């Protein structure tokens, strides 16, 4: 297994496992080629042999990938802990730089923050446990789906052969076509959408690492008694549509920094909207690429978050372009599977 350094590597590792599961399945189909496609007796014998190979497939996969999944899950926990440490360190740098600009801040006494930090430690461990538990369920699901698809292909191949598929390769390709189009989409979301293990892992780990990073930042702000943050424009980047209403707004971080729930800044008495309310309205949804930074009243540059009509139109076009790109990438993966794992030469060429 390749070295894992970030969520991209984890997604790639899961995608490699998915492709290995499919490749192993197709190799078995190829090695048990049925020569007499119109002989029912021969097909019955073929099914018996293939069902035996399925049991071996299940056993081998559980043994091989069980160890790989365990290693990956340990890396996931490590990445989440590292994300919090990085957020904490970066925030220390931000605040120390602000102090150089005569920011009147003093660290809050240990006693005043000890319980807060204990709570955050528990939150971090709960986040890690929830993420790895969900990944274990998804990992179990991908192996189960591979087994189910294997069995379905065995039975469907004979059905297609009996309806005039022509050759063994064509019969198997007809039986695998829908499966190869979709991939091992073993995870079903609440809205009914199905996703592969690699796609789900990308979303889950990116979301967990982001929350851990924001928690690390928040803990450091709490140490210095700073609770105000701002959702900045993303340079040349494009904010998520759900996050646009919050860009450029100063807020009280009552989620990760433990800011006052009434939204009133202890430093100036100014009342700001709460991060928790923004999250409830869609900020920091899964796969969100936006983030907030510390806003130090009297030191940080006042917000410039209002978008012109032209900027909003550009944002809409960028989002549409990104969606088209993501669709094209999904189509590319689909046809790569069909081309790589089809047995019939004509189908390989077609896809």
Segments (PLM) and residue ranges:
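N-terminal leader/targeting and assembly helices and adjacent pre-domain segments
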Residues: 1-175, 180, 298-299, 303-351
